[in-house]
Structure formats: structure tokens, C-alpha cells
Amino acid sequence: MGKRADGNDGGASGIAARLTDLHDEVARSAGTLEGRHVDRLRCGRGCRDCCVDGITVFEVEAERIRRHHASLLREGRPHPPGACAFLDPDGACRVYADRPYVCRTQGLPLRWLVRNEAGPTVEYRDICPLNDDPASPLEELGSDECWTLGPVEGRLATLQRELGGEPLRRIGLR
């Protein structure tokens, strides 16, 4: 396959590179938001309230974990049920450098839009209860002070489709 305009080939290695670029972009943007909310965020190493069983990720992201952590998957012991299988006994993430998108934005103030055919678009917001701050209600934050769900998921679905997968297929982390 030839190179695309962005310099990546269209095969698996090119898609893997684009996924890494996307994760890096998410990390930078999330880092900016973390800086804006430093007084409210209680997230940190060992905080695992968001790291629960039942979280699903895009198949293309699960493949990244499989590729970079084959020995952990083969020989490691998963965290006991109830928390993410990738947590170590101290609550630290064993795949942190390759963690999926959802894990890179956990804890941030989130917003998403629901477009109703019969009515107006409705905005919803949420945040981890540990990071809720009554002195700064979510409803009063500017849209640029929240992580907007949707755009990155769309880009992940595109990468997954290009890899040959079903665009919206999700994989459990356990």
C-alpha cells in the first residue's frame, strides 16, 4: 500500500501510528483541561474509582494493548474482579503508556450532545463524584472547560473501520 497524504501507509502499521498520534493529541488536550481544573481533580496514581470492570474500548485500542503487552497478557495475573484487569496490586495501571482513550479522559468534566429529531439538541454533563465541586457547578463551566464526547470516538471508529473492523465494535478490558 502506498503512503497517504499524512505520511502513513494505510496498513496496520500506519493505523497503529495514527492511533498513537491520536492518543498523544488526547493526552495533550486532556492535560490542558487538567491544568484548568487542578483544584477540583482528585485523580492520581492509585485512584481507581473509574477503573472498574465493564469498561469497553474500541477494538483498535485493544489491539494496541495486545501488541505492546503480550507478555503481561500471557503471564500476568489480572486484578481481581471489580476493578480493571490491568491494575497492579497497588492500583497503578500496568498498561498506562498504551491506555485507551476512555482512560485518558476519566475524571474530567464531560459534556455530550444528543440531537433529537423532534426537538432541540440537548447537552448533558457529568463528572466523577470525587471531582464534583459544589463551588464550581458543571452547569456553569464553559463548553471549552469540559471534554466533549463524540469527536474522538468518531476518529477511533474511522481507524477501526480502516483496520477492517466493525466501526463501533467494543472490547471489554477483562
Positions of PLM-derived features:
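Short loop/turn segments that flank or connect secondary-structure elements
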Residues: 1-45, 49, 56-174
